[in-house]
Amino acid sequence: MRWRLNLSSNQIVLAFSVFALAVFNSHYWQYMAAHAPFGEGHNWLLWLTMPFFLLACLNFLIQLTFWPYVHKVWIPLLLVLGAGASYAVMTQNIYFNADMIQNIIQTNPGEAKSWLAPRFVGWVLLTGVLPAALYLWLVRVRYAKRWYQEIGWRLASMAASVLVVALVAATAYGNYASFFRNNKGINHQITPVNFIGASIKTAYNVYDANRPLVQIGLDAKRTSAQGERKKVFILVVGETTRAENWGLNGYARQTTPQLAALGSEVINFPQVSSCGTATAISVPCLFSRMNRGDYNGNRAAHEEGLMDILQRADIYTSWRENDGGCKGACDRIKHVNVHDWAPKNECVSEGCWDIHLLTGLQREIDAMPGDGVIVLHTIGSHGPSYYQRYPQAFRKFTPTCDTNQIQQCDRQALINTYDNTVLYADHVLAETIKLLQNDTQVDSALWYFSDHGESLGEKGMYLHGAPYMIAPSQQTHIPMVFWASPGFYQHSGLNQTCLRDHAGQQTYSHD
């Protein structure tokens, strides 16, 4: 081809950095405008230096990875991934840290499909695929005549970046320290630095994870007396339900009418926090012996958890799945998936209506050789396709947001749709309790809690997965309820009145 852009490596890296800051980071600049307005205090200095500061940082980072031949793959890849990441940040206010990368890696095809909306595809094609194609087609790198000259020019560019950062630190350190301290986690929204750094950390975690399974609780054993009635404990792990919209917690709407109708039989815990803000963190955390402060995903993946110990103690264990996987918590026990028996017209790729978790549950309880713990992992209020989580009969609050492009919906319609998912979760829990009430041959109990909460547009944030230190309460404050049959209370020595008093007065968490 006759006409091509002959650019030096420094020019290409600088051009890419400018493009990324201008196109992929519009959300970041809008955030700055809202939280550090130009006319307030010394924010003018922040605005004057921030573009140069970020440009220098990105230039330095890309210089480290821009090498002959490699750049033909690396730059187009950064453009396409940057386009996808920037769309998530712009439309869903997503924070890309190692936990989010892990969450993406563990996303099943059904969840991924829900993101393939026309606007997403269009944005990636326009700002990622097209520039990548033009780069491959039109740009030719003009290297220096001598290898040491090329390295010298590259080092000079990196030195200039370091100098810019040093000058900014010398003149505006206080402004930067204040801005980033008051807006913790915003660095996870600067593209492509966010997903590059998070991917490096994730890769390190994967490397660090190569170790054998550690057994714990080797002395675990049952202590039931001979002739005691069989007990079953149903553990319902919810998905994305937040305490703020939970009727039993005093929400303005009655989103839990069926549980409320059970009166004092149901014990509600109004102050409960999750271990994480994403399923990939919360589920393995709550079944491990670690608490939130010292939780390590690699350690959890290579150490036995609660279900392993129960199984070793000769307690029947089973996991019924409707949310894309147990994240390792059920790997070594019996586990089944609701997709195997639920009607296809009552399922989407991410999951089925949660009521189908009860199919065959009574038969399973009857067949237990002794005491048992059965986990029901629900899809609950999983977004962004909230409207697909419940049957038409539970479309009580209208109008609804019947799309996965939730940021385009009227906020009240979005809340209506979400509240309908909570209403359906209430129904599923009530039906599970009814099943247990009807079985007079077994002492039974049910314990429900959500894995984490959800943002519904508060402060422009949607979905979940925010870094815990800056996560809003909507993502960490979760509902929790407990129910037990009279026989369970009697034979387990559990004091219902005492439990209810503690539930209303104390704070609890997954760990």
Name each model feature, range by range.
Residues 3, 11-13, 24-124, 129-511:
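Catalytic domains that recognize anionic headgroups
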